[in-house]
């Protein structure tokens, strides 16, 4: 579960940049 949460944070950061574009 914890690993999934960490992966989600990474995707969230990447997604944030993509959303900005």
From Swiss-Prot:
Q: Which domain of life is it from?
A: Eukaryota
Which terms are listed as keywords in the entry?
Answer: Amidation, Antibiotic, Antimicrobial, Secreted
Question: Where is the protein localized?
Answer: Secreted
**Cellular component aspect of the GO annotation:** extracellular region
Tissue specificity as recorded in UniProt: Expressed by the venom gland.
Q: Which family does it belong to?
A: Belongs to the cationic peptide 04 (cupiennin) family. 05 subfamily.
Quote the protein name from its UniProt record. M-lycotoxin-Ls4a
The beginning of the lineage is:
Eukaryota, Metazoa, Ecdysozoa, Arthropoda, Chelicerata
């Amino acid at each position: 579960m914890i690993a999934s949460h960490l992966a989600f944070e990474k995707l969230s950061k990447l997604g944030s940049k993509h959303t900005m574009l």
